[in-house]
Amino acid sequence: MIVTTTNTVEGKEIEAYLGIVAAEVILGANVVRDFLASITDIIGGRSGTYESKLAEGRELAIREMVNKATKLGANAVIGVDLDFETLRDGMMMCIATGTAVKVK
């Protein structure tokens, strides 16, 4: 499966547009981990804890979006966009959207 942020796939022709595919993933953060991450932020370092949570959310959302595209008969997803939202109580949401297409 080709997954790209561009609206075309170089060297490929789009045969069919199969529709918009989207996936939402909500992840919780641990209170102790939040506290330790805030200490890292205060002393000016990078928060590896949150970076790994963001990466986990991104990968899960893309995987779910690809699964939905596969069910539509797509072999590529173009125009992929990732959005992250912070929800209350330490929750984070990652949304992946794109257009499922068939390329040749």
Swiss-Prot record:
Pfam family, one: YbjQ_1
Parts forming coiled coils: none
Similarity section: Belongs to the UPF0145 family.
Name used for this protein in its record: UPF0145 protein GTNG_1265
